[in-house]
Amino acid sequence: MFSMMRQIKLLLIIQLFLSCSETTTLESTKPQTPEDLIAHSDEFKRELITVTDGVHVAVGYALANSILIEGEKTNIIIDTTGSEETAKEVKDMFDAINSNPVETIIYTHNHADHTYGATVFAEGSNPDIYAHSTTEIYLSRVIGILRPIISSRSNRMFGNALPKEQVENNGIGPFLEIG
């Protein structure tokens, strides 16, 4: 038994010395971006699309599209992008088409990329807001309580820590806004 323990110790010591041998550096190669993902980026080209008379959608400015519905005297906006900066850019385009005041803002759901640009679209008017009854609760919770963990997870999920040239798109839009 004693000699068996010595043999095990000796084998462990030999293993330790062998594992401390000179190491080689492995070269890291940049992973290839799949062609389908590159082609998918074409879906998010920045453009203003006229869907039909009086209905326009801004695509590629944020994760969520923003829609203008023209009225005779007032306009309706569906989803307001994820930041004031992007909302300003989209609003300026919409105003070039029809500068009527925004009477109504509709949120399709309570995510930041659909709601955080609302103050820009509401400027100069007091629009009615149409949303699910829980939208205010969820937005308040995200802003006040969950923001650190949501931000951390979103940044990791959408690749915000990667260099810009390594991010092709975010699957549902060009990039995640941090608004």
Predicted regions and their residues:
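Sec-dependent signal peptide recognition
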Residues: R6-I13
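Conserved beta-strand hairpin/beta-sheet module of binuclear metal-dependent hydrolase folds
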Residues: K45-A96
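Active-site HxH/HxHxD metal-binding segment of metal-dependent hydrolases
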Residues: D92-G179
